[in-house]
């Protein structure tokens, strides 16, 4: 049977949300490929994990969730060397399985791990790779994977095909789609495979893991993101965005313009040339809404725009718009949130001058 694979990600034995997003993409592709070639296509979720509880092993309930969210099969490759990400060993493990089972398509998330793993894997399998895709589809008639991604600095969208080599491989931007809802009635198989010790790269040993103190990657996982753009006018004014983000308990984002001007660092950039996000609330101030930026926030649940220009493109996508001076709106909103938080805590908010 033909197969479409998605490579799941785990941390400490817990599956990351991007694993379920990928399954939604994979399910659609497997169904379309099956219709195009006239035969069933199985969606397989490949999990690389540790072999002991408490040391990166993914339990049965978590693997079962992959079935409930769209997979037909789950293959968990397990071994102590897979408890934490190590590119050479991960790549060797997936390549060994791929040579045996010959999937048509392999997808991974365009995370730091996926962006490291997939090029190594493509070289090992003598296959092509399209990175940072925002759209994937199956071409009618040929059954080829259509891989769409931003090109030329995000100014155009290019669609790429791989007609002559298998597997077809792509990384997909996190938060560019939503996971399928869980369906407890779905049936599927779960297979655990022990990693062949010969595949372990002995040159690399993971001694420990440390979390990024600045939490830049949290932007993609944040439920609230506050972004600033060119309308802030200068770097010092970006504090208005940070203060509002703090008041909302959210992460700080930025438009490409703001990053290019040095007001925020690249890990905060939102859009096709930065990070694709899907928070519950996205509030942007001074962002006009270039097409690349809009594409990076299109799956946000609620979008609020603050911009003095009533014709700014961002207003067309926003659920709520404020046509006004951000230098008045943001401080007032931050102050109102601070007052509400203080009231909830039973404290009187401080006024300018230090008295309540």
Question: In which residue ranges do the predicted regions lie?
Answer:
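N-terminal glycine-rich FAD/FM-binding segment characteristic of electron-transfer flavoproteins
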Residues: 1-356
